[in-house]
Amino acid sequence: MSLVKPLTARQQEVYNFLKHYIETTGMPPTRAEISRELGFRSPNAAEEHLKALARKGAVEILAGTSRGIRLLLDAANDEPEGLPLIGQVAAGEPILAEQHIEGTYRVDPDMFKPQADFLLKVNGQSMKNIGILDGDLLAVHSTKDVRNGQVIVARIEDEVTVKRLERKGDVIYLHAENEEFAPIVVNLREQERFEIEGIAVGIIRNNAWM
């Protein structure tokens, strides 16, 4: 991103601290933390430096939160690579194996919480009652740490399904959100090829989000 004016040495120092702090902790610093680190007399002085950076297009100040700072410098060079779209999945192979990836969509994974790891095209209407429709792209966060009631992506043999999870001991019930579909019942003692691939964190359909 090009700036209206170059940063002063002090502004660059503030920006470098913001960047280092975010990379280290995963979140922006407060004004008090900026003041303490850089030797300002008060958080108000840090606020003035942030406003100067915002005027030059280096940061965006987000209202309503003490850590509401977003870095904008070089944002054009930091575009996300995108999310892989998963197609047919072969039994016994990782869902993100190269041969399963049909393409890549330029979607920022951080738009979803938790972060999305891949997209899955929805086939059928088994989840229509909660707005997951045939043809939607489902954003999925890869994890095996799931809870009852969550909408998950599961694999049974070479079939991938999106359902709401209910687990009772060694028996898993995968519930549809459509009265026309019966639950899928999986007995973990009998079914060897059952994998939980992740949880649904959003959908892409004409800019609508789940």
Swiss-Prot record:
Top-level taxon in the UniProt lineage: Bacteria
Feature type site, description Cleavage: A91, G92
Pfam families: LexA_DNA_bind, Peptidase_S24
Enzyme class, broadest EC rank: hydrolase
EC number(s) given by UniProt: 3.4.21.88
Annotated SUPFAM superfamilies: LexA/Signal peptidase, Winged helix' DNA-binding domain
One Gene Ontology term of the molecular function aspect: serine-type endopeptidase activity
Keyword field: Autocatalytic cleavage, DNA damage, DNA repair, DNA replication, DNA-binding, Hydrolase, Repressor, SOS response, Transcription, Transcription regulation
GO biological process: DNA repair; DNA replication; negative regulation of DNA-templated transcription; proteolysis; SOS response
Described function: Represses a number of genes involved in the response to DNA damage (SOS response), including recA and lexA. In the presence of single-stranded DNA, RecA interacts with LexA causing an autocatalytic cleavage which disrupts the DNA-binding part of LexA, leading to derepression of the SOS regulon and eventually DNA repair.
Family assignment from sequence similarity: Belongs to the peptidase S24 family.
Subunit structure: Homodimer.
NCBIfam families: lexA
Protein name: LexA repressor
Organism of origin: Actinobacillus succinogenes (strain ATCC 55618 / DSM 22257 / CCUG 43843 / 130Z)
